[in-house]
A protein has these predicted regions:
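A conserved structural/catalytic subdomain of Rossmann-like adenosyl-cofactor enzymes
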Residues: 1-172
Length: 172
């Protein structure tokens, strides 16, 4: 519901595939896949649409499309991480000037240290690209993607914890 601006009732979209090769019907429940714009409106992002579309590809057995999508997500994610890392130093300097307690300064320092570990992840990503760029075996490449994601998990968990800690210190 609230997906279409002129319709107040829930809606269902049906897509018919004339080149369908089997008798199976794919139904995707996308009720919880959206970005809330305001109280009354929801919107699909480009990533939401890609994720829903890839489900159809997986249903048809085209796993290589899924692996390619994950590669694009990794590339875009690394690009955003590098962009954000460049912004960390100026913002942390401003925070250190404003914060007058030791706890806040320590929290900022821990976040800066966490961002410094991004260099190892960039190296790991470059190794992944070099080793698996031309990989044709879908299972092997997908396994490598899972391992790469696992390498990033501690970075994001620590970053999340650090931001929560900084937020808590600033609010006190």
């Amino acid at each position: 519901s609230n997906m279409f601006y002129t319709v107040t009732l829930p809606a269902t979209l049906w897509f018919f595939d004339k080149a369908k090769t089997d008798d199976k019907i794919l139904f995707i429940d996308a009720r919880n896949i959206f970005t809330q714009i305001d109280r009354a409106h929801r919107e699909f992002s480009e990533e939401h649409i890609q994720n829903i579309a890839i489900i159809s590809q997986l249903h048809k057995g085209r796993r290589e499309k899924f692996v390619q999508l994950i590669d694009r997500y990794f590339a875009a994610g690394m690009e955003r991480l590098v962009e954000n890392k460049a912004r960390v130093e100026p913002v942390s300097s401003q925070l250190l000037e404003v914060l007058d307690d030791a706890g806040g300064k320590q929290a900022v320092g821990e976040l800066v240290q966490q961002w410094a570990t991004l260099a190892k992840l960039k190296t790991r990503y470059a190794q992944y690209q070099g080793k698996h760029a031309d990989e044709t075996a879908v299972d092997k490449k997908n396994k490598a993607q899972q391992q790469l994601r696992e390498a990033f998990d501690p970075f994001f968990a620590a970053l999340h914890d650090g931001l929560k800690h900084l937020d808590k210190v600033v609010r006190q």
